[in-house]
């Protein structure tokens, strides 16, 4: 149904970090899937191209995959590598202050990455859409007038499937979104 299926790894995808060559061998066997790890792809046609950048990194969180020190230079460098002309940014974790509060029983605010938030806030051209997950209780959507922020976690803090997948149509010229399906807590 879709021309492109793009995904990134996350904190549970240790194979992609520990065995990247084998992981990519498996991914390449699925010709209809594009895996992005600190990389981008352009989709569309000659009249309308959209640049999508994806990255799996996150501030250190337990002993999971793709962890880097929260305020470290290496993590800052990952975000600095995001091209300035990115239309859609896909990261495993949220930017601090954007759909990054955990749900019960934790209820912790601002678990997102402060370095990612700073990078986006100070970018000359901000992404039109930022899609993330990771912080399960932050599942939802908000629009700040420039960027559409999505946390598309489908699990709650107990790893139960409680949120529906998100489906929307997006006009890259007007930056308007029409929801086809969204979570119950929109």
Predicted regions and their residues:
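Residue-level preference for short coil/turn positions at secondary-structure junctions
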Residues: 1-2, 48, 82-85, 126, ...
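Conserved beta-sheet core of the metallophosphoesterase superfamily
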Residues: 3-7, 24, 96-176
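Conserved catalytic scaffold of divalent metal-dependent phosphoesterases
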Residues: 7-115, 154
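Residue-level detector of flexible, active-site-proximal loop/helix-junction positions
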Residues: 12, 42, 59, 137, ...
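Generic preference for hydrophobic/aromatic residues in regular secondary structure cores
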Residues: 32-33, 64-70, 141, 158-159, ...
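Short, well-ordered strand-loop elements centered on a beta-strand within folded domains, enriched
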Residues: 52, 148, 174-185
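Active-site regions of metal-assisted phosphoester/phosphodiester hydrolases
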Residues: 76-79, 88-92, 114, 163-170, ...
């Amino acid at each position: 149904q879709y021309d492109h299926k793009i995904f990134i790894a996350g904190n549970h995808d240790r194979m992609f970090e520990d065995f990247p060559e084998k992981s990519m061998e498996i991914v390449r066997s699925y010709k209809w899937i594009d895996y992005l790890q600190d990389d981008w792809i352009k989709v569309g046609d000659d009249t309308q191209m959209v640049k999508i950048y994806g990255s799996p990194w996150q501030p250190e969180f337990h002993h999971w995959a793709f962890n880097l020190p929260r305020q470290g230079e290496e993590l800052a460098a990952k975000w600095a590598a995001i091209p300035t002309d990115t239309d859609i940014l896909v990261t495993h974790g949220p930017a601090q202050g954007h759909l990054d509060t955990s749900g019960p029983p934790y209820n912790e605010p601002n678990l997102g990455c402060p370095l990612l938030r700073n990078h986006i806030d100070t970018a000359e051209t901000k992404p039109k859409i930022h899609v993330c997950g990771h912080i399960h209780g932050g599942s939802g959507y908000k629009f700040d007038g420039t960027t559409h922020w999505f946390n598309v976690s489908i699990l709650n803090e107990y790893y139960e499937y409680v949120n529906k997948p998100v489906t929307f149509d997006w006009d890259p010229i007007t930056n308007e979104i029409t929801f086809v399906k969204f979570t119950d807590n929109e």
